[in-house]
């Protein structure tokens, strides 16, 4: 019932990101955009971009099942009814047999279309307010390097066994880092993140090149001198060492030297230590991209006189600017960006379902319902680096599709980030199952660390026209 309400009140009325302008560059190019049980054709015409309901007006067959190039018309493969690229009716085989059908009345139903920084948006509600009004001042946050000066270098789409909202919530905060991503704690001030909300979007800034404040009182915390990023790692919270024995097998050594073995799902095999961190077991013992197992744990070696954390952070930022200057110097001036813009994780959540990151962290996310199944979703990870030459951008990457049981590391184009997404994927199916099992039928959000999630739900209440005074949103609705 809640999913049906979302389709009626949200997906049928809200501006949503459909594709890239670069993905349909020429007349006749088209992109199929699907959300819930709705399907749209986004088409490049002689006069610009249009979006139509992807359904034949004869007997309902999809006009196109996948993206394509250079179409001269939109012809249904079932009986041959055809429309021009502008949506007007072109042809009906045996037209004499349809005396009630007038071509001028059978144009394809349109959705609103607009663009923003190289992205194409659609809105099924033809009476909706303009996209510019919906996005507000979002463009100001990306003015130093707009997305139309970047290119899509990777695009991975994975089916997840979790509702699209619960999946998205996992990427709205850094609060989960201490438990889910222990390998990030040495370089991420997770609990020191800043959260800001705007009308239809929110932002988080999680500082890098600083340690997590959770490590401040860890007396046993010490970085392994002979450690390896993906093969031998000391857990920063309890000091246990996790070593890769082989694919799927991890040795865990505690502070007293006791050893046990676990598989990469943290299932105990032997030894006196009977519990292990499932996220670190997957990180160390799970599938790993080629060449990553030998990556050492190395700290930057700053020059003399660079001693304090603030000085080291500024030095690392300067190095990143120099690296960027060599690769994107024609497009942006790295000196125009602050240390925070260069180093930190700046991630936005634009209602209802997409998340762009800042210039120097190229990640970009989108979530959609998986058809009409509220217990599953489609989670997409893209990367948008700055184009070295803004006048000669590479073509957008093709989509790699992963099933619910596929490991993220299959997507080698994501590099080490694939390992991080795999850690998140350990939690999410169990979040979905656990929400269904709750007795109290409510969840609790942190006052500050989960600000973005609170903001998301305020927007959901508003769009679904639900008053908190008369309707209870239970975990089943998430």
Show the residue positions of the predicted features.
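Short Pro/Gly-enriched beta-strand edge/turn motifs at strand-loop
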Residues: 12-23, 92-96, 345-351
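N-terminal acidic leader/helix
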Residues: 233-234, 240
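A charge-rich, low-complexity, intrinsically flexible signal that marks solvent-exposed coils, linkers
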Residues: 234-235, 266
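Glycine/alanine-rich phosphate-binding loops at beta-alpha junctions
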Residues: 2-36
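A short, structured beta-strand/loop element
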Residues: 240-260
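Rieske [2Fe-2S] iron-sulfur-binding domain
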Residues: 23-126, 130-141
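Mixed-charge, Lys/Arg-enriched low-complexity segments
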Residues: 260-294
């Amino acid at each position: 019932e809640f999913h049906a309400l979302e389709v009626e009140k949200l997906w049928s009325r809200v501006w949503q990101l459909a594709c890239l302008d670069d993905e349909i560059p020429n007349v006749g190019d088209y992109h199929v955009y699907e959300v819930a049980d709705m399907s749209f054709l986004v088409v490049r015409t002689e006069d610009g971009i249009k979006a139509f309901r992807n359904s034949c007006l004869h007997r309902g067959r999809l006009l196109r099942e996948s993206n394509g190039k250079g179409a001269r018309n939109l012809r249904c493969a079932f009986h041959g009814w055809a429309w021009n690229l502008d949506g007007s009716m072109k042809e009906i085989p045996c037209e004499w047999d349809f005396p009630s059908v007038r071509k001028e009345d059978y144009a394809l139903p349109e959705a609103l279309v607009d663009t923003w920084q190289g992205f194409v948006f659609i809105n099924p509600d033809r009476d909706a307010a303009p996209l510019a009004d919906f996005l507000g001042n979002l463009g100001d946050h990306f003015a130093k390097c707009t997305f139309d000066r970047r290119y899509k270098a990777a695009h991975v789409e994975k089916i997840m066994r979790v509702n699209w909202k619960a999946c998205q919530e996992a990427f709205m905060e850094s609060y989960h880092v201490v438990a889910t991503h222990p390998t990030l704690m040495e370089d991420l001030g997770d609990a020191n993140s800043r959260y800001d909300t705007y009308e239809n979007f929110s932002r988080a800034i999680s500082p890098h090149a600083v340690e997590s404040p959770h490590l401040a009182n860890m007396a046993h915390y010490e970085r392994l001198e002979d450690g390896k990023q993906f093969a031998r790692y000391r857990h920063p919270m309890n000091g246990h060492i996790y070593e890769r024995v082989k694919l799927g097998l991890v040795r865990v050594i505690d502070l007293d030297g006791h050893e046990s073995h676990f598989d990469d799902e943290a299932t105990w095999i032997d030894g006196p230590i009977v519990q292990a961190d499932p996220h670190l077991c997957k990180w160390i013992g799970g599938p790993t991209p080629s060449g990553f197992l030998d990556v050492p744990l190395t700290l930057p070696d700053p020059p003399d006189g660079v001693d304090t954390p603030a000085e080291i952070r500024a030095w690392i930022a300067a190095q990143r600017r120099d690296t960027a200057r060599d690769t994107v110097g024609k497009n942006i001036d790295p000196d125009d960006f602050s240390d925070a813009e260069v180093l930190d994780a700046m991630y936005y959540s634009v209602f209802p379902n997409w998340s762009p990151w800042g210039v120097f962290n190229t990640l970009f996310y989108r979530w959609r319902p998986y058809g009409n199944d509220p217990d599953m979703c489609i989670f997409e990870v893209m990367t948008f680096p700055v184009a070295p030459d803004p006048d000669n951008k590479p073509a957008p990457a093709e989509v790699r599709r992963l099933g619910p049981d596929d490991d993220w590391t299959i997507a080698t184009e994501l590099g080490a980030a694939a390992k991080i997404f795999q850690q998140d994927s350990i939690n999410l199916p169990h979040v979905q199952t656990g929400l269904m099992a709750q007795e109290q039928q409510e969840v609790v959000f942190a006052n500050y660390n989960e600000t973005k999630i609170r903001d998301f739900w305020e927007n959901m209440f508003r769009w679904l026209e639900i008053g908190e005074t008369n309707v209870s949103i239970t975990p089943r609705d998430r």
